[in-house]
């Protein structure tokens, strides 16, 4: 077998008949499979042991040779080689065909490769191949030319003879007619009888003339066909062909079926044809040039690849190994077989029948029919259903052909090569494990025992609990007591991987240290639920076991959950307190006025109370029950750092040191909370809303090592759960309070609604106006009920606590629960003007319930559709970007992109850019950030973290130049400096990081949160596409719905306002030609934008527009942006538009992820003029390859190729990849493989997908070449331990040999006397 680690490219080509015969171990001659009595394979059949190898290890068919000692012998009785049975998975056979057949992929694919090569229309080709027309294969022009006059004379003689014969016959008939008429006249017959005789005579003469004319026409037809006869000419009329064959057979050859195609290919001169086509392309125009270009693609492919086009017509068909198309016996003695066996049997049956017919010398028509059937059976074997009706099995099910085995989700690529089942894995339901540390998970004992079985067995033998592996296995199966102790020992420090489907981003698989737990459910740490998107309502998770030391090291260092706190999409922590924990910490840090033991200032006759000398004293007071944790107190602190402003005031420039005392006015709860934070973190004296907690953890992640952050979030989790329990937050019906003012509020609005109804009935309002008015009224009513609700609820109401703390829910839900549901929409997305006045607490009326179901059902249907769409989008994104890997540290480019940090207002103040988090943050500076005085604030090459951004803003810098993957010049992949900081680690990205896949996951994972809706914007006719459809539209580079024109030039606008359309003319500033935009629908409305004077208003006559400016509402077409403004602008446009959709849903994704995808969309150049290069005009070439080839040509002082950048959608870009393995496993498998085989494509195995398919380590992360051949050396200590010299003491040697030091003994001065 091939060792996958030792080849680095994979080439695919066309197999010739010779190749097929070379691969084969023998010819399959019979359609039989196995003998149904003996169940042994039939000789020479589809499962023959002689061809494919023995069915039992080391045993021949007849049983003469058994056992391994006869290895390699070929039995002289049955001819079977004695070897392993697994060779039946790799040995191929073949079928020798009695007549050649064409390969359906090359004839029927679009475009038809055979048709392009031979310059035949696919329809004509089909007629030839399926025996409906003859084709002329060759003409002896010279001989025909020499003998043309003689042949013409012969033809003239023949024609003369026909004419003479005709004339003679007519003459004789005319005379007979005359005689008959004369006889009738003599008899005095009636005029009627005479007329009948004359008519019949004339009719016969007419028939004579017609017959002769037909004969003459036939001769004319034969002659004209013969004189114009040329190769590749079709003759559909069989009689005409027979005549030509009889008369002029020596001047030409012709045939039908695949044989004729084979002959045409044999005589085809590829080089000459390529030269002719290149000439046509250079000098031709229009359709002719286009056709020549398409044909040259196929011809040049054969010319350059050295493939023989003969491979498109087969003389032999390979038979794949029998184990890959098995036949198995079912219960009840019936057999189940792979469809391929049926298809092969059809081929063999027809082939054998054809051989017999040829031997019998059957008539041509019968032989041709059999050949056609053979062609059809081979077509069905290769690609069933591609032409005509598919061959069906029992129950009218189309049989699965070789092509179907590769295609689609169930095909070989996606089912078995990209998605394999894994050993050492298990799955179970998950429950919460609040007692766990962040890096731990609870593993059920039984599951752990099964997973670690081999490890446990080995350890049992090592510890002498069992004599051998077999008895150890028995011990494990019987679950003896010793087994559990050994299991504890084995799982220590051996991480396991937990995965929850769907794995939408890389945090869907994380490593944990297992802790054994009773029961059968896996226990999961509550803080990782966010990353897995898990909850405990019955979710299941899978466990996988990393086996090798390397795998364990990767799991522990790279995948351990405590090292994966940050989101790879935004760089913000995902392991945040949620739900109960938020409620607990919120409760703990709330300050309640005048609570038990609160601080009281000193009165005239009373000392101040609620003052404590240390947190310990305060805790003691709380334990005694005299102080509430939520009461305000004064406390002296020595171990907590004061907030910045207090620190400056109290401790000056030296700053606070641990042990320095200061007094805080706070609550005991807040002191307890601050004790959870790392030492030296400034005291936070606030109520802990979820957002505040998030900000703190964010800050910790920026400033402290991951291990500290992990410990802190664990402490926050424990404290959160503890205080959530103490707080007694529960929800009961009694907590849902309906505001008493609700009825009077609704009554007042009901009156207003009635007034509107009356106006409508009087005709003062039309239907739409009435609806709008009602919707406004009821929106106000709902808001007012909400306000009344808010005022009526006490602050410590559990529902309000849950909502206010940010734990879950929002105020709208509270209002629905206790106030009123308000307006709902119908399926079209319009508000129904009757509101739902009841709350869920009171219960809905039947009508209210009914109108509420509209929205609810639409929501559910939407979610289901969205999930599938979002998954498909992720799949396409991953496919387009899977080979973007960080390849080097720095590409040394000077280029970069400008990003905004802030906007300067009119009064000179700076307003921080709201999206700085996702644009400038975590990038590398491409040029020094300089303030107005010219001082460098942040130097080039620095990483922009929060402190650096703050420094720039403080220095008044509004924009900086940063490195970006869009301007990176690394050939394949990107460089670390252009990519910048890895969002997941907070450090510069490592070489080998698969940033493409991280980008695809970051964009795809929140896809399910995006809406499916198209938004109705008041009065706009065209819907504005939003949500997921908009993201797809952008990444597929489609022309958007309701596309808006953009200005091609800078100039003044002349606006003509028609009845239904606008006409915009731009008069260019440079005096060039005017640009006219005609028929712009008024429903789309003109664009509002900022004018030169700073005002915002609609585009109007006489305005000045810049190049690329949008003129109407809607979305610009990215292809136009590329044409008008160039690649840089279209990149910025796409990134901005995608971000707009995600920001609308409150999803934070860093720009760099979108840039990685956009870079892949703009990787190619379309060739306009090939110059002196090998490129074909119109072909799409990778930019790096294009530039390299041009440099080479210019160096040889040739003419470089001219090309223009092209924007490709992600599906098209995935299929245009250089890796045929990756493209074939993505979509359109047969088309990709056909194309790759003709071009003899070579896959360099650069991407991840190709390597997964062939089973190599992926070239990313620890799989990149620099880590491939690392040899691990033991340390000195390990070496010393391994090679210690045993102490043999005195029982082995005499005392003279020294005290077991291992020192050499000088034998010369050693006495041998004692031993003699």
Swiss-Prot record:
This enzyme's EC code(s): 2.7.7.6
Sites where the protein binds Mg(2+): 535, 537, 539
Residues the record lists as binding Zn(2+) 1: 60, 62, 75, 78
Sequence positions that bind Zn(2+) 2: 891, 968, 975, 978
Lineage: superkingdom: Bacteria
One term under GO cellular component: DNA-directed RNA polymerase complex
Biological processes annotated in GO: DNA-templated transcription
Reactions accelerated catalytically: RNA(n) + a ribonucleoside 5'-triphosphate = RNA(n+1) + diphosphate
GO molecular function annotations of the record: DNA binding; DNA-directed RNA polymerase activity; magnesium ion binding; zinc ion binding
Keyword terms: DNA-directed RNA polymerase, Magnesium, Metal-binding, Nucleotidyltransferase, Transcription, Transferase, Zinc
Pfam families: RNA_pol_Rpb1_1 (PF04997), RNA_pol_Rpb1_2 (PF00623), RNA_pol_Rpb1_3 (PF04983), RNA_pol_Rpb1_4 (PF05000), RNA_pol_Rpb1_5 (PF04998)
Transmembrane portions of the chain: none
Similarity comment: Belongs to the RNA polymerase beta' chain family.
UniProt name for this protein: DNA-directed RNA polymerase subunit beta'
Organism lineage: Bacteria, Bacillati, Actinomycetota, Actinomycetes, Mycobacteriales
Name of the coding gene: rpoC
């Amino acid at each position: 077998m091939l060792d996958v680690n030792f080849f680095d490219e994979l080439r695919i080509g066309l197999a010739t008949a010779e190749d097929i015969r070379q691969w084969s171990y023998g010819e399959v001659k019979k359609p039989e499979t196995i003998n149904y009595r003996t169940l042994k394979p039939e000789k020479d059949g589809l499962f023959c042991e002689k061809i494919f190898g023995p069915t039992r290890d080391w045993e021949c068919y007849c049983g003469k040779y058994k056992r391994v000692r006869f290895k390699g012998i070929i039995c002289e009785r049955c001819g079977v080689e004695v070897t392993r049975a697994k060779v039946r998975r790799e040995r191929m056979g073949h079928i020798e065909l009695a007549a050649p057949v064409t390969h359906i992929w090359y004839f029927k694919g679009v475009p038809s490769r055979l048709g392009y090569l031979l310059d035949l229309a696919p329809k004509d080709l089909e007629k030839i191949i399926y025996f409906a027309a003859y084709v002329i294969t060759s003409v002896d022009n010279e001989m025909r030319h020499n003998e043309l006059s003689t042949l013409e004379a012969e033809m003239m003689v023949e024609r003369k003879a026909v004419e003479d014969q005709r004339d003679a016959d007519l003459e004789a008939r005319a005379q007979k007619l005359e005689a008959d008429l004369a006889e009738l006249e003599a008899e005095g017959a009636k005029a009627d009888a005479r007329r009948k005789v004359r008519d019949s005579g004339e009719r016969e003469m007419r028939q004579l003339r017609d017959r002769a004319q037909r004969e003459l026409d036939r001769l004319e037809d034969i002659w004209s066909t013969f004189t114009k006869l040329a190769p590749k000419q079709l003759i559909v009329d069989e009689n005409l062909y027979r005549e030509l064959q009889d008369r002029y057979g020596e001047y030409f050859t012709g045939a039908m079926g695949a044989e004729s195609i084979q002959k045409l290919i044999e005589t085809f001169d590829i080089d000459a044809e390529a030269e002719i086509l290149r000439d046509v392309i250079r000098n031709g125009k229009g359709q002719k040039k286009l056709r020549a270009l398409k044909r040259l693609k196929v011809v040049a492919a054969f010319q350059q690849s050295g493939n023989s086009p003969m491979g498109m017509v087969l003389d032999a068909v390979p038979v794949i190994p029998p184990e890959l198309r098995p036949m198995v016996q079912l219960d009840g003695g019936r057999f189940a077989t792979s469809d391929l066996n049926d298809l092969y049997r059809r081929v063999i049956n027809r082939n054998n029948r054809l051989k017999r017919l040829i031997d019998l010398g059957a008539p041509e028509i019968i032989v041709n029919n059999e050949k056609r059937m053979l062609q059809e059976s081979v077509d069905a074997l290769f690609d069933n259903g591609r032409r005509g009706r598919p061959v069906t099995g029992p129950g009218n099910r189309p049989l699965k052909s070789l092509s179907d085995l590769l295609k689609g989700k169930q095909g070989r690529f996606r089912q078995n090569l990209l998605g394999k089942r894994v050993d050492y894995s298990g799955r179970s339901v998950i429950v919460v494990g609040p007692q766990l540390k962040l890096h731990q998970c609870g593993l059920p004992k039984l599951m752990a025992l099964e997973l670690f079985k081999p490890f446990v067995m080995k350890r049992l033998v090592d510890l002498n609990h069992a004599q051998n592996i077999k008895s150890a296995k028995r011990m494990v199966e019987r679950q003896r007591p010793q087994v559990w102790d050994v299991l504890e020992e084995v799982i220590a420090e051996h991480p396991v991987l937990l995965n929850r489907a769907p794995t939408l981003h890389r945090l869907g698989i994380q490593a944990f240290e297992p802790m054994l737990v009773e029961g059968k459910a896996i226990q999961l740490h509550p803080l990782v639920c966010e990353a897995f998107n898990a909850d405990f309502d019955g979710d299941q998770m899978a466990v996988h076991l990393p086996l090798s030391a390397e795998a364990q090291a990767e799991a522990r260092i790279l995948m351990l959950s405590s090292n994966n706190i940050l989101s790879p999409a935004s760089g913000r922590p995902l392991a945040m307190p949620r739900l109960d924990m938020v409620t607990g910490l919120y409760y703990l840090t709330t300050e309640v006025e005048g609570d038990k033991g609160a601080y009281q200032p000193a009165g005239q006759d009373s000392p101040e109370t609620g003052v404590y000398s240390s947190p310990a004293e305060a805790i003691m007071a709380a334990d005694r029950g005299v102080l509430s944790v939520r009461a305000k107190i004064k406390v002296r602190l020595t171990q907590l750092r004061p907030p910045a402003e207090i620190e400056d005031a109290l401790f000056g420039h030296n700053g606070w040191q641990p042990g320095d005392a200061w007094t805080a006015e706070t609550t005991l709860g807040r002191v307890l909370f601050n004790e959870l934070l790392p030492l030296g973190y400034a005291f936070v004296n606030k109520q802990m809303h979820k957002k505040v907690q998030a900000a703190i953890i964010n800050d910790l992640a920026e400033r402290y090592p991951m291990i500290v952050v992990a410990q802190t979030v664990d402490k926050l989790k424990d404290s959160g759960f503890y205080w959530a329990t103490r707080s007694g937050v529960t929800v009961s019906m009694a907590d849902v309070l309906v505001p008493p003012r609700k009825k009077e509020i609704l009554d007042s609005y009901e009156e207003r609604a009635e007034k509107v109804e009356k106006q409508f009935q009087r005709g003062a309002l039309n239907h739409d106006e009435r609806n709008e008015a009602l919707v406004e009224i009821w929106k106000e009513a709902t808001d007012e009920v909400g306000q009344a609700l808010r005022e009526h609820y006490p602050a410590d109401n559990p529902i309000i606590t849950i909502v206010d703390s940010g734990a879950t829910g929002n105020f709208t839900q509270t209002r629905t629960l206790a106030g009123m549901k308000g307006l709902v929409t119908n399926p079209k997305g319009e508000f129904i003007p009757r509101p739902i006045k009841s709350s869920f607490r009171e219960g809905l009326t039947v009508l209210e319930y009914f109108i509420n179901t509209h929205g609810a059902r639409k929501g559910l249907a939407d979610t289901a559709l969205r999930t599938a769409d979002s998954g498909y989008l992720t799949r396409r994104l991953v496919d387009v970007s899977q080979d973007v890997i960080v390849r080097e540290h720095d590409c040394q480019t000077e280029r970069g992109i400008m990003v905004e940090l802030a906007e300067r207002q009119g009064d000179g103040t700076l307003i921080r850019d709201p999206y700085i988090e996702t644009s400038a943050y975590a990038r590398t500076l491409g040029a020094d950030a300089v303030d107005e005085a010219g001082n460098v604030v942040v130097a080039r090459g620095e990483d922009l973290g929060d402190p650096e951004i703050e420094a720039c803003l403080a220095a008044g810098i509004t924009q900086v130049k940063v490195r970006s993957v869009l301007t990176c010049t690394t050939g394949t992949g990107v460089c670390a400096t252009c990519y910048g900081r890895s969002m997941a680690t907070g450090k510069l990205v490592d070489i080998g990081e698969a940033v493409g896949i991280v980008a695809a996951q970051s964009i795809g994972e929140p896809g399910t949160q995006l809406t499916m809706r198209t938004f109705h914007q008041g009065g706009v006719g065209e819907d504005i596409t939003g949500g997921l459809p908009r993201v797809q539209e952008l990444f597929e580079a489609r022309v958007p719905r309701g596309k808006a024109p953009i200005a091609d030039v800078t100039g003044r606008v002349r606006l003509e306002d028609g009845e239904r359309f606008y006409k915009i003319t731009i008069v260019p500033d440079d005096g060039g030609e005017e640009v006219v935009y005609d028929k712009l629908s008024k429903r789309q409305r003109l664009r509002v934008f900022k004018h030169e004077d700073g005002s915002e208003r609609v585009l109007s006559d006489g305005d000045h527009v810049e190049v690329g400016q949008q003129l109407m509402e809607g979305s610009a077409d990215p292809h136009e942006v590329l044409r008008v403004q160039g690649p840089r602008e279209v990149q910025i446009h796409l990134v901005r538009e995608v971000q707009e959709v995600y920001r609308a849903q409150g999803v934070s994704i860093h720009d760099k992820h979108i840039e990685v995808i956009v870079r892949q969309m703009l990787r190619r150049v379309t060739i306009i003029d090939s110059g002196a290069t090998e490129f074909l005009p119109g072909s799409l070439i990778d930019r790096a390859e294009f530039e390299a080839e041009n440099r080479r040509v210019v160096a040889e002082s040739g003419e470089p190729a001219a090309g223009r950048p092209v924007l490709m959608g992600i599906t098209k870009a995935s299929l245009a990849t250089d890796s045929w393995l990756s493209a074939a496993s993505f979509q359109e498998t047969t088309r990709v493989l056909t194309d790759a085989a003709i071009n003899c494509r070579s896959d360099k195995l650069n991407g991840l997908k190709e390597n997964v398919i062939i089973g190599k380590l992926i070239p990313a992360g620890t799989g990149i070449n620099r880590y491939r051949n690392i040899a691990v050396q033991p340390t000195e200590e390990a070496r010393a331990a391994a090679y210690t010299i045993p102490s043999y003491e005195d029982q082995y040697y005499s005392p003279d040999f020294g005290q077991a030091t291992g020192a050499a003994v000088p034998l010369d001065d050693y006495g041998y006397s004692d031993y003699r």
